Regions:
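Residues on the lipid-exposed face of transmembrane beta-strands in outer-membrane beta-barrel proteins
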Residues: 31-35, 65-69, 101-107, 120, ...
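Start-of-domain marker
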Residues: 20-79, 85-86
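Residues that define the transmembrane beta-barrel architecture of outer-membrane proteins
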Residues: 25-27, 59-63, 95-99, 135-141, ...
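Transmembrane beta-strands of outer-membrane beta-barrel pores
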Residues: 47-53, 71-73, 82-88, 107-109, ...
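Cleavable N-terminal export/targeting peptides
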Residues: 1-22, 217
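Detector for outer-membrane/organellar transmembrane beta-barrel domains
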Residues: 113-161, 215
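Repeated loop/turn-to-beta-strand initiation elements of outer-membrane beta-barrel proteins
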Residues: 40-45, 74-78, 110-114, 153-157, ...
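Predominantly the C-terminal beta-signal and adjacent terminal strand-loop region
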Residues: 160, 169-217
Length: 217
């Protein structure tokens, strides 16, 4: 645990040094509960808080309920999820609803695991305060490639990933996320993670420190 805290502090220091005046610095803090219903089906509930404006502004609360289905053992799985997204706007809170479908393929080579994930999401915006989406729902296809390495003796899993966003209505890929970090399995029920994410948007860039906790029933 002391090693993990040192790792988090190092990430915070690096992020603070790398952010320019035009960019933003934030954080993602998440807690996830998951349960295996059968050999092929897992369900999960996640709460995530997102901070922006140099960690001074509560930007979003995301509540996600999902299920994963193993299609080919250890190599292919599908998933569906629903997210309630509460955004903290200037004078009000805005609630969006998001439907998600995913397909993930993975392969192992020694201690390395390579994976590709395709995700479709449709975000429905509450139009009570006006609609910032020109098209409602806003539909996006996301493609993510990641590599993870296993240190089996210490149950540590460093990873690196890149994810591109394609907005269907605009027919444009205008956002890419790059992430690096590590997951640490404490025991058969508890695990923690820490990482750094660079959100490369068309108009602005945001650097995030990510901290997560997972409990498996």
């Amino acid at each position: 645990m002391k090693g993990l805290m040192k790792y988090v502090l190092l990430l915070l220091s690096c992020a603070a040094l790398s952010v320019s005046a035009e960019d933003d610095f934030g954080g993602n803090i998440s807690v996830e509960l998951s349960k295996k219903l059968s050999k092929k089906i897992d369900i999960s509930l996640e709460e995530e808080v997102r901070l922006t404006q140099n960690m001074s502004h509560f930007d979003r609360l995301a509540s996600t309920l999902g299920a994963d289905f193993k299609l080919i053992k250890k190599h292919l799985k599908g998933g569906v999820a629903y997210s309630a997204l509460l955004y903290n706007e200037m004078n009000y809170c805005l609630l969006n609803h998001r439907a998600i479908a995913t397909m993930t393929g993975s392969a192992n080579a020694g201690n390395f695991e390579f994976s590709l994930r395709a995700r479709y999401q449709a975000t429905f915006q509450d139009e009570s305060y006006g609609n910032s989406h020109k098209v409602n729902p806003k539909q996006i296809v996301r493609g993510k490639a990641s590599v993870e390495y296993e240190f089996a003796k210490i149950k540590l899993y460093p990873y690196i990933s890149a994810e591109a966003y394609y907005e269907i209505a605009k027919k444009d890929c205008n956002r890419v996320k790059y992430a690096v970090g590590a997951k640490k399995k404490i025991d058969r029920h508890n695990s923690v993670s820490a990482g750094f994410l660079f959100d490369d948007k068309l108009k602005s860039n945001i650097y995030y420190v990510q901290i997560g906790y997972n409990y498996k029933f």
